A protein has these predicted regions:
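Short amphipathic alpha-helical segments and helix-helix/interface helices
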Residues: 20-21, 100, 120, 167-170
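Glycine/serine-rich phosphate-binding loop and adjoining beta1-alpha1 elements at the start
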Residues: 1-85
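Short Asp/Glu-rich motifs
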Residues: 41-43, 122-123, 129, 164
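Glycine/threonine-rich flexible loop motifs
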Residues: 1, 9, 157-167
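Short low-complexity, flexible loop/linker segments enriched in glycine and/or proline
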Residues: 45-49, 125-129, 169
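Short, acidic/turn-prone active-site loops that include or flank metal/cofactor-
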Residues: 12-15, 35-37, 116-117, 137-139, ...
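Glycine-rich phosphate/diphosphate-binding loop of Rossmann-like nucleotide-binding domains
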Residues: 68-156
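Short, surface-exposed loop/turn motifs that are enriched in glycine and acidic residues
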Residues: 47, 141, 160-161
Length: 170
């Protein structure tokens, strides 16, 4: 690493503090894909990584749902003669859509909660019929939690917020 080097990549500085300190110490210019905002306030370079994160998140649920990892042992996939698992996803952005695509492709019953009617309509056109869309509010979330096998948080959350979407008592 040398002074003046320009690094243009996914940096995720909050999650990689030591790396960030090294970049700063060596006077390297770091441009993080995930922090680039377009004129509409969107994060265009974060979109593909977010979709991958959603798909990878569901794959992680498959993995950690196994009893050897402390999970329930439910296979998060449709199997004849067994109750279809329910996957609830909070957020209908790129991450939520990626998670929903992966979960739905295995025949799960998928529910997405979001506050944006337009984004849900757009997602509805992309996703299969085993995906249900609900307005995200406390009442709907609590109803969904009753029979959810996997709950995925797929929303961009302001780092300064101190409130929660789901509480232990839920």
């Amino acid at each position: 690493l040398r002074e003046g080097l320009i690094v243009f990549t996914y940096i995720h500085s909050n999650a990689h503090l030591e790396m960030t300190k090294e970049l700063l110490k060596n006077k390297i210019i770091g441009i993080a894909y995930e922090d680039i905002i377009d004129k509409n306030g969107k994060f265009p370079l974060l979109s593909p990584m977010s979709e991958l994160a959603g798909k990878g998140g569901f794959l992680a649920a498959l993995h950690y749902g196994q009893t050897i990892y402390g999970g329930t042992g439910v296979l998060f996939s449709r199997v004849t003669g067994v109750n279809t698992p329910v996957i609830t996803i909070i957020g209908c952005g790129h991450t939520g859509i990626g998670a929903a695509e992966m979960a739905a492709s295995l025949g799960n019953r998928v529910r997405i909660l979001d506050i944006g009617k337009e984004v849900m309509e757009e997602a509805k056109a992309k996703l299969p019929s085993n995906v249900e869309f609900l307005y995200s509010n406390r009442t709907n979330l609590l109803k969904c939690l009753k029979d959810t096998d996997v709950l995925m948080n797929c929303i961009l959350w302001d780092k300064t917020r101190k409130d929660h979407l789901v509480y232990k008592d839920d």
